[in-house]
Each structure stands twice: as C-alpha cells, then as structure tokens.
C-alpha cells in the first residue's frame, strides 16, 4: 500500500477539528473525511466515522496494522502542516 495523494480539503484555525483530508492509496482508492483533531496530547488523525443509534462513533474505514496507521498519520499531518503554512503566508 502506497499513499499516492493527500488533499487537505478544509482547514479550520479555530476549534478542535483542524482539517478535513482525503487520502488516496495506489492511485486507485480514496478515503474521504479523514480529520485532523487537536487533542490533549497534540494533533492526531481521526478516521471517518458514523454515529450509531446508541450515540457511539464507529470508524467507517480504518487501518488494520499499527504500521499502516503510522504511515497515514505522518502523511496527513505533514500535508496539514503544509496547508497551514500556505494559508498563513
């Protein structure tokens, strides 16, 4: 699996949700609505999710391995930092 594109679709300077991102894998599969969120320990990547009737949030798509999660997180956070720098400049 290779991440071939990361597009930051929306950047929020205020609030805990900082960005909405789309991640493309192998130029063949895209996951939309990946979020960059500011938590207590800094920024983290939240996968797209839906709210269940019980009020819980369940991931729609998510990485299976820790290595894949790390690759996605690094790529998304790097793209977010670049988008943030160009938005401020």
Curated annotation (Swiss-Prot):
Q: Provide the alphabetized UniProt keywords.
A: Cell cycle, Cell division, Septation
Under Pfam families, the record lists:
SpoVG (PF04026)
SUPFAM superfamilies per UniProt? SpoVG-like
Entry annotated with the keyword Aminoacyl-tRNA synthetase = no
The record, for InterPro entries, names: SpoVG, SpoVG_sf
GO BP annotations, alphabetical order: division septum assembly; sporulation resulting in formation of a cellular spore
Which protein family is it in?
Belongs to the SpoVG family.
What does the UniProt function comment say about this protein?
A: Could be involved in septation.
NCBIfam families the record matches: PRK13259.1
Give the protein name, as stated in the record. Answer: Putative septation protein SpoVG
Which source organism? Heliobacterium modesticaldum (strain ATCC 51547 / Ice1)
- Gene name, Swiss-Prot/TrEMBL: spoVG
């Amino acid at each position: 699996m290779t991440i071939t594109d990361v597009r930051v679709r929306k950047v929020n300077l205020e609030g805990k949700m900082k960005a909405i991102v789309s991640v493309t894998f192998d130029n063949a599969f895209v996951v939309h609505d990946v979020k960059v969120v500011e938590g207590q320990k800094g920024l983290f990547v939240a996968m797209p999710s839906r709210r269940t009737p019980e009020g819980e949030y369940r991931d729609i798509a998510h990485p299976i391995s820790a290595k894949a999660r790390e690759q996605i997180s690094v790529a998304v956070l790097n793209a977010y930092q670049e988008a943030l720098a160009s938005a401020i400049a």
